[in-house]
Amino acid sequence: MHKPVKNVVILPADYGQDTARRWPVVYLLHGFRGRYDTWIGKTQPGLPEAASRTGEVIVCPDGGYSSWYWDSPTDPSMRYETYVAEELVAAIDSLYRTRNGRGGRAITGYSMGGHGALYLALRHPETFGACGSMSGGVELCPFPKNWDIEKRLGPYRDNPQRWEEYSVMGQLWRAVPFNDRSREVAGLPAQDPSSELQPGQLAIFIDCGTEDYFYAVNLRLHEELLYRNVPHEFIVRPGRHTHDYWRHAVEYHLLFFRDFFAREIQPQ
């Protein structure tokens, strides 16, 4: 993008004690109007302690205020899919002692970041082995005038297929088509079946509060995952679209990822 992008990197307290040890990494994405330090400065200041408890390096990238973590088809200055899923991952693996394979990487986030985490994981399962979403904006079409989406994709009325394609739901239909007809209805091109998501390839964790304005689209995503026999965990709790909700939710996500990372290092 030809510009500096800031990130917060949180290391477990004992990172420096065993120089032979390699650590799994969790990429933690902020929501609309957030920035690289929103997670540690506002949402969950206890992330350093959490990283030490779970034994995970936590990386909080800047998502460009309202990038939705896309490579925008209308704004070349917004290429956050490439930045997070390729450039940042490569930089973190080169600078820190990481487990630099998909079995050592997870990605999650809240709101816009929940969308971004699932979107990137579905598009880059070779990079991320686990993913999550807290109150994620996983379907875009019901919100044609909100959160700068129109700036990134163009007006919905002019680009309905693009809005579908750039949503988590559209990426699910692409990655796990129920049949050829579902791909046709989604307006998605045919692809090599070998590129489709395999059962259990991604460990997926989704949660949303029952009073959240994204609750209905998260419930629909859960139902679509069930319909396509995609294993996942889905948690519903009382709560709204607030930092207080995500402060508690992130603890569950980090534990889910800890268990995933532990399974990945067990002898087969």
Which residues does each PLM region occupy?
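Non-catalytic cap/lid and distal C-terminal segments of serine-dependent acyl enzymes
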Residues: M1-Q268
